[in-house]
Amino acid sequence: EELMNIEEKRLFTITIIGGSQGAKIFDNLLHQILAKVSKSIKIKIIHQTSESNQNFLINFYKENKIEHHVFVFEQDINKILNKTDLWVTRGGASSLAELSLLKVPFISIPLPSSMDNHQYENAKFYEDQNSCWIVNQKNFYKQNFEDLLLKIIKNKEEYLVKKKNLENLNYQNTWINVNQNLLSILNEN
């Protein structure tokens, strides 16, 4: 019970990472949406951006009284992962796998120009497991994204289901890998 009280007092933390191919949409639109969300729910923002946009975002979050950490590069990304409740990212396979492994629920906004739509396919795998949310950049509307964030933050039940499904997915994948390795060893002998 004490842990629950501590957890409730901590600000809901949203991390925004554009990935190696960057994400102008993350810099150009999300900060405005997050400012609106912060009017009804206190949140903390961790935001990766470009050097050219860093000061703008720092000042924006300060002016809107949003607790924040804006950075260009973070040497120890695990430090951030451990403090994050929700991740907003593209759909890179390694990023999504790492978030899955660490059981960090995420919203994926796949890069629409990715080759063979692979970022969408990566995110769709997790969505099919009911362990993430996908937002299509081509149909991105500020109000819809704001509504989604508020729903995620307020509806702890859905959020916890996604988190639990990530945990179950990793448990299943671990046993599948162990079984495949054992079969491989047995077949060699």
Residue ranges and their predicted role:
Residues 5-87, 120-123, 135-145:
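Donor-nucleotide binding loops and adjacent catalytic segments primarily
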Residues 31, 142, 146, 175-183:
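Short, amphipathic alpha-helical "lid/cap" segments that border enzyme active or binding sites
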Residues 66, 82-97, 104-105:
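Acidic donor-binding loop of glycosyltransferase active sites
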Residues 89, 105-116:
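Short hydrophobic beta-strand element within catalytic cores of glycosyltransferases
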Residues 103, 120-132:
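Acidic, glycine-centered active-site loop in nucleotide-sugar glycosyltransferases
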Residues 77, 95-103, 108, 122:
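Short glycine/serine-rich donor-binding loops of glycosyltransferases
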Residues 6, 133, 138-172, 188-189:
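Conserved donor-nucleotide binding/catalytic region of nucleotide-linked donor-dependent transferases
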Residues 73, 93, 111-115, 138-139:
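Short, acidic/turn-prone active-site loops that include or flank metal/cofactor-
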